[in-house]
């Protein structure tokens, strides 16, 4: 199906949404999946890999999980030549209940058979198609769903400068429980007017995590600083929760890094930390 968000065609979008279960997305391919499942016994489509994990497709995954998803092929970026988009293929048997799912990966060059219920376990916010024993060992030691995620969408280079009143932290400034100073990279602003991110200024219980990386590391937000969109700002989902530097240092370990790669389904493009993926930045139990 076409991969396109309908933004200007309001009337057409309302027609599509009138029949859709998932009205949280404007992307046509989601409507194609639903209609195909209504009229077909066996449905197989190549769609963006974001179907697996993005919050806007939560309801689409719910629908699919109730049927038998017999195959998932992860093409990574190899689906279409010269097109830098990650894609997957799935086969859904709409008149059969879940059983086993065959996962074929162009990334790992392996074929693995797992119980569908294991890969689509509802205790996680989305499907984990590379889930394995190593992933489970780390997951069993962690308490999840500790944070909410925020990302600035306003601050650009044109708004920042080399010196100023308030420091604007960017992804490379974030180290393991430390802020890294980088000459000619560090940024500042003088005026926070109109910047929504200013609400976090001097709130020291906020946690900073770089976006778009398989090299996770975290630190607390220092006073006198904010962060641009290359950094996720995490706040506690429950204010009674206590997060320590030891909790944050776990994110920089090899064990968590490998766990996190599986949690992100070995994706390469859509690695922004959203309110689904932030789930996995938990804290160690006890």
Locate each region found by the language model.
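Signature of N6-adenine DNA methyltransferases within the class I
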Residues: 1-145
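Polybasic, glycine- and aromatic-enriched phosphate-binding surface used to engage nucleic acids
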Residues: 133-286
